A protein has these predicted regions:
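Bacterial N-terminal signal peptides
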Residues: 9-19
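Extracytoplasmic soluble-region selector
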Residues: 24-300
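Feature marking well-ordered beta-strand scaffolds used for ligand recognition
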Residues: 255, 272-683
Length: 683
């Protein structure tokens, strides 16, 4: 049954709103050129500068028209008469006249270059380094800080020494001590210098012992931790003796021509490829080594296609699978640019996915759907409502086969809800990418604003809550962690308290999934990028003349009907100590880009857009690139010849549930698959 819910006050507001733009669009044909207030913009990161554009006719007179002004998301913020620089780089603001629907005229347009610069450097700090012994090398590091207190990422430092006879320093801060004496090491960046003074003494080490070598073979991807123990002539351990680590590789049969074979970080080693690996520790004139074999991880499982709920009318967005209050299993999917449709399925039998209902609300897109853990309510996000008060729609799921609208809620979230997170009593909803609002839904017919969290100078895409901590994915800011009930930092749903944040090198944090790993006692954060282009790469995507991946093929123009192209990967942070998070691993497929994810039972279920659904073994300590370690368990790239875009994979969201894996594909709808048990070889 398809049901349509219209909210009449919104329709009257729509008429009042569009009257002025429609009148302005009628003037579009008078415009001959656009005149910007400045020909180009230069902005210091975090600052804003005035920027306006006027439309004029052939005589130079102003024309009242509606303009579309766009810039790169997350890099520039374009407001009412101002532009704010969010990330340093060179960008372009594009401006065009909005023409009436159906017009074939090319609208006047212009492009304005924008350069966002870093604030000036205020200080350089050399981090504490170990004692310098003659005959050893110690790598130094330094950080540069801007006048606003922020750190400059990856500063190109210049290193220098006061006495090359005592110690030299390379371009990367590696200080090699040659003789006893005093030496000053300097680090400079953009005219600011810092220094550290070393007293070089004789190396007292007499013996080096290497501990931690495995007794037998290991698997690729297993982390092996070594310890180097340096002793002096009396047998006492030298705690501050600098140790350098190296790794060698001997190919076994069939393994010639392999890429990087492993990764070494201090005393930790992980093999990427099978073969004989050798780890060597060196301290001054002393060295010790250990050799061992790494065998294939051998985790591949067959994946069986169980069921498919085709959706070819609209582009499918996110999914949520849950057990209803009647004990049966259900799925909800959203849709993009559909006029506000959500779809409801009975998935109790995953091989017979059955659409049982649809619901249309006042929205252009339903990007996200959620249900409470107890199945009491569901919620639909809204973007593009006719009255520009987007908010969300809360559904009473007392009868899961007949969802009822319990409430429309928009307090504090009128500017567009892109993502949400549902708990039994609280609902977390994004507000126009600026903040998230916490709503008391104890009574779903009377939801109440409780509190909100808005991280300074940051834009967010998603929020996920686990064990009283809210993890918001905030693009260049990275992941922001807030206490909303954990209590260790004094937070609660009514009083969110900031805990920490962690920025990734790519600056495109789109989704976060926290995971506690029982075997190691570690808590990992899986941070997913979203980068909707491949500019600058060898495979850069399809030409613009082909149209948009979002459109079905148009035989008249020959455009549309092709897959999207993306990039980006999963970055894995050890969050066991929240005050000291550390990036330790990644899962990167170079040809594709990541979207939503789920982690459960030592498996990563990754929606990899055009790379399909990918299931990855994340057992044991994690280090290096999981993709090159043979940790992929299964991959499936769904296609449908009758999909919204035929035979074009675009996996959006995934969720394991009761032994099956459900996922949504933008072009083909809802799918269910199952990992089959590994078969023992027949001898």
């Amino acid at each position: 049954m398809k049901r349509h819910f219209f909210f009449w006050p919104a329709l009257f507001l729509l008429i009042a709103f569009v009257t002025a733009p429609l009148a302005a669009q009628q003037n579009a044909g008078l415009v001959t050129r656009l005149v910007p207030s400045v020909a180009q913009l230069t902005i210091v990161r975090g600052d804003e500068t005035p920027f306006t554009v006027q439309a004029v006719d052939a005589s130079g007179a102003l024309v009242h028209v509606e303009l579309r002004i766009t810039g790169p998301r997350g890099l520039l913020q374009i407001g009412d008469g101002v532009v704010t620089g969010l990330e340093p780089g060179e960008y372009t603001i594009n401006v065009s006249v909005v023409v009436p629907a159906g017009s074939t005229a090319t609208p006047p347009s212009l492009s304005v270059p924008v350069v966002v610069t870093w604030p000036a450097v205020d200080r350089v700090v050399i981090l504490h380094a170990a004692t310098l012994y003659a005959g050893t090398t110690v790598t130094h590091s330094a950080r540069a800080f801007n006048v606003d207190g922020s750190a400059r990422p990856d500063p190109d430092l210049t290193w220098a020494t006061s006495d090359a006879a005592v110690a030299t320093v390379d371009a990367f801060g590696g200080v090699s001590a040659h003789a006893e004496g005093t030496v000053t090491i300097r680090a400079s960046f953009e005219g600011v210098t810092s220094q550290i003074v070393h007293g070089v003494v004789a190396f007292p080490g007499a013996a080096l012992e290497l501990r931690g070598a495995p007794d037998g073979s290991v698997r690729t991807g297993d982390v092996v931790r070594f310890e180097a123990v340096v002793r002096d002539a009396s047998g006492a351990i030298l705690e501050d003796a600098p140790v350098n680590w190296s790794h060698g590789y001997t190919a076994t049969a069939g393994m010639l021509g392999v890429p990087a074979t492993g990764q070494m970080k201090q005393g930790a080693f992980v093999a990427d490829v099978p073969g004989i690996h050798t780890v060597t520790a060196t301290a001054g004139p002393l060295s010790a080594r250990a050799s061992f074999e790494a065998k294939p991880r051998d985790v591949v499982q067959e994946l069986e296609i169980v069921g498919h709920g085709l959706e070819d009318w609209y582009r499918t967005t996110d999914i949520w699978i849950f057990e209803g209050v009647d004990g049966r299993d259900y799925a909800i999917t959203g849709s993009k640019v559909s006029g506000g449709f959500a779809f409801f399925y009975d998935v109790t039998d995953p091989s017979a996915i059955t659409k049982i209902d649809s619901l249309q609300v006042d929205a252009r897109t339903i990007n996200d759907v959620k249900a409470s853990p107890d199945g009491r309510y569901a919620v639909l996000s809204r973007e593009g409502a006719t009255n520009r008060r987007d908010g969300l729609v809360i559904l009473d799921m007392a009868d899961p086969r007949n969802p009822r609208v319990a409430a429309l809620y928009d307090e504090g979230i009128t500017g567009g809800v892109h993502n949400m997170f549902a708990e039994n009593d609280y609902l977390y909803a994004l507000s126009n990418g600026d903040k998230y609002v916490i709503i008391d839904v104890t009574d779903i017919y009377n939801p109440k604003y409780l509190s909100e969290y808005n991280h300074p100078d940051s834009r967010l895409h998603d929020v996920w809550v686990q064990n009283g901590l809210a993890y918001s994915s905030e693009w260049g800011t990275g992941v922001v962690v807030v206490d909303v009930g954990d209590g260790r930092w004094g937070g609660s749903p009514a009083n969110p308290v900031f805990v920490t944040s962690y920025a990734t090198p790519t600056g495109r944090t789109h989704a976060t999934f926290p995971y506690y790993q029982e075997s190691t006692g570690k808590t990992y954060l899986f941070l997913g990028d979203e980068i909707m282009n491949r500019r600058g790469l060898a495979w850069a995507g399809y030409p613009r003349s082909w149209g948009s991946y979002q459109n079905q093929y148009d035989p008249e123009t020959g455009t549309g009907g092709f897959p999207l192209v993306t990039r980006g990967f999963i970055q894995i942070v050890d969050f066991t100590q929240p005050e000291n998070p550390e990036m330790v691993a990644r899962y990167e497929m170079p040809e594709f880009g990541t979207h939503n994810l789920w982690v459960e039972d030592d498996k990563l279920y990754q929606s990899y857009y055009e790379g399909g659904l990918r299931v990855v073994d994340i057992s044991g300590e994690l280090m290096g690139n999981l993709y090159t370690q043979g940790r992929e368990i299964a991959v499936f790239k769904p296609v449908s010849p009758v999909g919204y875009v035929a035979n074009a994979t675009m996996v959006w969201g995934t969720q394991p549930f009761k032994g099956h894996v459900f996922f949504s594909d933008t072009n083909s709808g809802l799918w269910s698959v199952k990992l089959l048990p590994r078969r023992r070889p027949i001898s």
